[in-house]
Amino acid sequence: MPVLHNRISNDALKAKMLAESEPRTTISFYKYFHIADPKVTRDALYQLFTALNVFGRVYLAHEGINAQISVPASNVETFRAQLYAFDPALEGLRLNIALDDDGKSFWVLRMKVRDRIVADGIDDPHFDASNVGEYLQAAEVNAMLDDPDALFIDMRNHYEYEVGHFENALEIPADTFREQLPKAVEMMQAHKDKKIVMYCTGGIRCEKASAWMKHNGFNKVWHIEGGIIEYARKARDQGLPVRFIGKNFVFDERMGERISDEIIAHCHQCGAPCDSHTNCKNDGCHLLFIQCPVCAEKYKGCCSEICCEESALPPDEQRRRRAGRENGNKIFNKSRGRLNTTLGIPDPTE
């Protein structure tokens, strides 16, 4: 059977999604379990998702599934039932429902087979990814935040940490998850007697990170079940204080969910308080950066005067300038480590 995929242009699909009158629900989920033939599973799931008008990004590998999707509100329960029935390993799977959702997170379904559902760079044959740390629920998270023997480790990238994080959480400065894993072990060597609490957006990265820490001799390891999304939802439902500060970066068109009223980041151009990510409008750049409304107007959505000038050129001249240029204009640091541009929304598996 040929590989199933979308054949309609992105512009047409986006216009169709924006014209929809039915509300949509943004959902994320993951599951580490053995998939014997990811390609066969991919095609079967593609047909199931397409029949229910599901959009989003789904990765499959022998180690499991990782998905961020948008489902028509009227199809959510049908989707849940069919997903649970698809494989015994998926029965009862936790679905993280978006907190701050306009239903415009995705407009196309992209489903890919990869070597890993999270690019971890681990090649140790003795590593047991199932030997994970203990789960923490919302009330337990708050208790740990008040425990002087606990250290919270943020297993997200710098651009995610920059706009929001737990109180006093430690950032592991790196551009990718695979770079963070060895760095986390190195940074925590002097704190093996502490309680290590790991977290990420929806749980997939911190779950594997907790197993990696245990593999490297850390015995007191926890991770937040369902990540920031599930913590904030459960804390609100249970009337608990929400101790996450700022915005939770998400890997779709929204680029963020408001968790608290505090704005802890700043515009990369003028320094004003701001936590709104955008991609540079220059097609030769598309750098991910933080831009306030004033600078968005001043620079016409671009990251610099150079990009502003280039984006105003005739299309043929823009293409000529882009030819042979591997990266964008590299005005801002994506992380503290090095200059790096990101085309479009970052890949959540990196």
From Swiss-Prot:
SUPFAM superfamilies documented for this protein: Rhodanese/Cell cycle control phosphatase
**What Pfam families does the record point to?**
Rhodanese (PF00581), Rhodanese_C (PF12368), UPF0176_N (PF17773)
> Which UniProt keywords are given for this protein, alphabetically ordered?
Oxidoreductase, tRNA processing
Q: What is its EC number?
A: 1.14.-.-
The Rhodanese domain sits at: 146-240
Alphabetized InterPro entries for the sequence: Rhodanese-like_dom, Rhodanese-like_dom_sf, Rhodanese_C, TrhO, TRHO_N
Query: Enzyme class, one word?
Result: oxidoreductase
Q: What does this protein do?
A: Catalyzes oxygen-dependent 5-hydroxyuridine (ho5U) modification at position 34 in tRNAs, the first step in 5-carboxymethoxyuridine (cmo5U) biosynthesis. May be part of an alternate pathway, which is able to bypass cmo5U biogenesis in a subset of tRNAs under aerobic conditions.
Q: What is this protein called?
A: tRNA uridine(34) hydroxylase
Q: What is the lineage of its organism?
A: Bacteria, Pseudomonadati, Pseudomonadota, Gammaproteobacteria, Enterobacterales
Q: What is the gene name?
A: trhO
